[in-house]
Amino acid sequence: MALPVGDVGEPFVDADDIADVAVAALTEDGHAGQIYEVTGPRLLTFAGAVAEIASATGREIRYVQVPIEAYVAALEQAQLPPEMVTVIKTLFTEELDGRNESVTDGITRALGRPPRDFADYVRHTAAKGVWNGGATAAQGAVPEVGALLEAL
């Protein structure tokens, strides 16, 4: 997996936890006026996330940090719409810069239980065979990004 993100920790949050908080906030008493910043229970780098996926699937997957300029060029070469490229570039240069390196108690406050850990999500998803599609990291969903990885 090739992305323009270094060793910044992210509080990966399970989409099911987000949905559960939304349902609770919209259907249960006691949530009016509350603000729930939802995060996973721990910080994890993208390299760490890839390592957990590799371990759970038994597949050899590696993470490679690439320069943002090369990543953007690969997206443009793949003919992604310019506005999509801008959003992705902003995400990687302004949002994934360390400002999110914190864990909150939003899920616990909203649901009365801890957030689901990324490792649990990975084990559950791997058991379903979702990542057994056969595409290699070098091929990727965007061939130009795969070619960038091959060149490194």
Predicted feature residues:
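Oxidoreductase cofactor-interface core, primarily capturing Rossmann-like NAD(P)-dependent enzymes
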Residues: M1-R62, V66-M84, T90-D97, V145-L152
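Conserved active-site and cofactor/substrate-binding residues in soluble primary-metabolism enzymes
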Residues: V13, L44, S102, R113-R116
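Short, amphipathic alpha-helical "lid/cap" segments that border enzyme active or binding sites
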Residues: A15-V23, T104, F118-R123
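Short alpha-helix boundary/capping motifs
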Residues: Q77, P81-P82, S102-V103, G134-A138
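Short helix/strand-capping connector loops at secondary-structure junctions
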Residues: N100-R109
